[in-house]
Amino acid sequence: MTGGVGISYEFAKFSVIGFMLIGMFFVGFTRKSWPYILFMVLLTPGILFSAINLDYDTNFLSAISFNLSGPICLAITALYCFKRKITRERFEHILLAILLPIISMAVYLFLYTPNIRDVLSGTHSNFAASGGYGPNQVATVLGLGMIILFGRIITIKSRFINILDLGLLAFVSYRGIITFSRGGIVTAAVCAAAFILVYFLTADRREKSTLLPRIAFIAGVIMVTWLYSSISTLGLIDKRYSNQDAAGRVKEDVSTGRAELMKTELDAFYEAPFTGIGVGKVKEFRLDSTGIESATHNEVSRLFSEHGLFGLIALMVLVTTPLSLIFKKKQSPYLVTFLLFWLLTISHSSMRIAAPAFIYGLALIHIIHAKPRTIIHRK
């Protein structure tokens, strides 16, 4: 986005892997996180079949790195984070550390992208409004910022911080909406609803009494932000979310081609249901069968097609392992929220960026309340 030279877009994923390995070197990881070791083992047969099935002119290492850097990043992060105890205050500091770069990105988009009316060309995703980077990925990250800001407004009991976060929520939401990429924004809305539900079920009576006014303020801010976005885009954003083109005609495919990509990946799974067709092979399979040259947008169907039965078991490991944490009494609402963010994001944007992998790991953290220190007074 900023025109950086020499830094790969995979840098973030490998950085997360590196930091997590350093953390495990110093403090280790719990034995109960063994399912994520199993997850990595289940990915290895796909590498073997990739070496057998990939075309001769395909760069084997690039294909493996592009498709497995995300899952490996997730597994390493989960190994480190699973049931790791952390205080609520420290967890909020981590969320703030995630939020601040997202705000910086939103400010960059505000300063260095053209006026949205100057780059309107229809109801498709807008690269110019996304800083020249993938609108899907930009909207995903901005959606993550919206989720964190939403959680802060609900949980932090400070009027000044709440007002500041409401303003930032409006700003980040606006920048996310005008990318014209729906995935990240819809994901943020679903995750916010899940956060409210879990918070309401686990909060005490005093916390519940403050919930409704806060939700009302947030709803008002979002409505005003959407109205401003609609005016700024001359109503095209309304047509985008109504699945219409600029002329107001309803589009046949609400998934913008993702359903066709998913269909070819499932066809590949039916062709080799036990072994899969090999890591990175689905792109070649799609080109041969449909003439469409496109990477996957759905990590779930990619696991099925490229890893076969091993991919199905691997997905079951990722879904079922956190279930042991969900039903614990007084569980943090961030657990369900972050798991939903991971699942919805990999379903529309695969694992192009490190965010879904890292956020999945954060969902596994065990948040505890810090005990007040006992002060010993000397006579």
Language-model features: locations:
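A membrane-periplasm/extracellular boundary helix in multi-pass inner-membrane enzymes
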Residues: 110-113, 199-248, 266-271
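Transmembrane alpha-helices of multi-pass inner-membrane enzymes
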Residues: 335-344, 350-379
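Hydrophobic transmembrane alpha-helices and their immediate junctions
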Residues: 200, 306-342, 370
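Aromatic-anchored transmembrane helix interface
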Residues: 11-16, 36-48, 57-81, 93-99
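N-terminal signal-anchor transmembrane segment
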Residues: 1-29, 44-54, 341-343, 356
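Membrane-interface helix-loop-helix junctions at transmembrane boundaries of multi-pass membrane enzymes
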Residues: 25-37, 152-166, 203-213, 322-337
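Long extracytoplasmic/lumenal interhelical loops at the membrane interface
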Residues: 119, 125, 129-131, 246-307
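Alpha-helical transmembrane segments of multi-pass inner-membrane proteins
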Residues: 92-119, 133-202, 325, 339
